[in-house]
Amino acid sequence: ANGVWRARISFFDHDVPCETQWGRWFASYTAFQTHYAALAEAEGCGLFLTGCEMTMTEHRETEWRALIAAVRQQYHGPVSYNCDKYGEDHVNWWDAVDCIASSGYYPLKDWENQLDRIEAVSKKYKKPVLFSEAGCMNITGSSAVPNNWELKGTRNDLEQADWYSAMFSACAKRPWVMGFGVWDWP
């Protein structure tokens, strides 16, 4: 609760005395995730995400694979991980999950280009894609920077509606897109 975005979680790649180490962090995070995986199993949840936008941890492939395996011991439904926008082709362990999940905060005029890029990842891993976060604020200019939660300006419901229309239209033509989780923008 220090206000730092989880994408900034990072440690030295080699153990350094007096510094938090990846092994200890992943052990703690795995315990956290397996606790919630057991709850998700008990409640009959339809999908379990092992993390979201943890960009600086994604290169720790061995640890992520072990965490996903531990989650699968507790939760028997589909499992994934949600990468940040533009990060779909940076995760090397999509084969360990059931779908490729991403934060779909792409500019209104760039959806087709981004879907072309993401399609290559979907084909490589033979996995559908879920935009488990997607959305755009109702502020003038937000369709160009839909992930900017600090954007200030004039209310513009039409710009927000145009962004959603573009996203849904572009994705409707791509059978490998399995769905969306719409972020709670105003």
Ranges and model annotations:
Residues Y29, Q33, W64, W111-Q114, ...:
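Aromatic/hydrophobic pocket-lining residues that form the small-molecule binding cavity
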Residues A31-F32, A42-L47, T57-N82:
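Active-site neighborhood of glycoside hydrolase catalytic domains
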Residues Q73, P78-S80, D84-W149, S165-G181:
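Glycoside hydrolase catalytic-domain groove-lining segments
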Residues T34, A38, A69, Q73, ...:
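Solvent-exposed, polar/charged alpha-helical surfaces in well-ordered, non-transmembrane soluble domains
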Residues V16-T20, I139-A161:
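A solvent-exposed, charged loop/short amphipathic helix patch at secondary-structure junctions
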Residues E63-A66, N148-E150, G179-P186:
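C-terminal/domain-terminus segments
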Residues A1-T57, W185-P186:
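Substrate-binding cleft and catalytic face of glycoside hydrolase catalytic domains
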Residues F26-T30, T55-T62, Y86-H90, P107-E112:
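Acidic-and-aromatic substrate-binding clefts and catalytic sites of carbohydrate-active enzymes
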